[in-house]
Amino acid sequence: MRSLFISLLLLQLSTLSLSADLQTYYKDFMEAHGYPLEENLVLTDDGYILSVWHLTPKEPNGRVVYLQHGCTDTAWTFFQLGDNSLPFILLREGYDVWLGNVRGNIFSHNHINPELAEVHSGFNEHSMDEMVEYDLPAMINMVREKTGAKKITYIGHSQGTTIFFMLVMHNPAFAEEAIDHYVSLGTVNNIANTLFPPIEILDRIAVIFQKVGIFKYMSLTNAQRNLVAKFCKTSPGVCGKAIDYALSIKPSGRMDYKSLPLFILLSRRCK
C-alpha cells in the first residue's frame, strides 16, 4: 500500500509543466559541462511537434549517435549521472550526440493544429504505434539530414528499445537504411509479467478518466508544486529513498539525489 501511494505521488509529479526556471536550468546544466544545447523542432506527418536535442563534440570523430528515452520520461533522463552521464561520455569520445523526445512528454507537447490542445482528448489519443510510425522516422531523418550521415547509431532505453524493435518489424527497410548499430539499455518488449502492481491499477484509472472526459491526469496547483519542490530540495535523500522503495530498487549510490526534483518535474507519463 505504501508503495502504491508513493507511486501515485510520483505519477502526479510527472504531469507538471515546465516553469521558466526549469526551462533554463537543463540548458545551463549542459553548458556548465562544456556542451551548449541546441534544440531542434521536427514536425511529424500527423502534425505533432517534437523536440530533438543536439550536443556537439569538441573533437568530432565523424560518428553520429541518437539516444531515445523510455516510458514516462524525457531525453533529460540520460543526464542524471552528471559528468559521467552517457551523452557526456560519448561527446568526450567525439560522437555527435542527438536525443529525441517522443510525443506527449514535457518537451514534445505541441501540435500544428492550435485547436488540438494538450488537454484535449485528441492530443493524447496515441500509443507506441504512432511513435513508431511517425515519431522515430521524423526524428531520425532530421538527424540524418542535418548531419549528412546515411546511417546513425541508435541507443534506446526501456521503451526506447521497445519502439525500436517495433520499428524494425513495422518498417525494416527504413531501419536497414538509417541505422548501422543498435544498443539496448534496460530492454523491454512487454510488461505483461511485471511484478509492479500499481501499473495494472493505474491503467484502470486511466480508462475511467477517459470515459468521464479527463485527459490530463493529476495536475498540481502552484502551491502544491512549490511545496513538493521545496521538500525534495531540502530532503533529497528522503525523496530518493522513497523512489527506491516504491520501485523496489536497491540503491546504487550513483544517483544524484539533489537532482531528483528536476528529474521528477521533467518526466511525463507514457501511453
Identify the meaning behind each predicted range.
Residues E145-K150, T162-K271:
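Alpha/beta-hydrolase-fold enzymes
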Residues R2-S19, E115:
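Cleavable N-terminal signal peptides of Sec/SRP-targeted secreted and luminal proteins
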Residues H69-C71, I152-T161:
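Conserved alpha/beta-hydrolase "nucleophile elbow" surrounding the catalytic nucleophile
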Residues Y25-P57:
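N-terminal cap/lid segment of alpha/beta-hydrolase-fold proteins
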Residues T44, T56-N113:
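Short, surface-exposed "cap/lid" segments of acyl-processing enzymes
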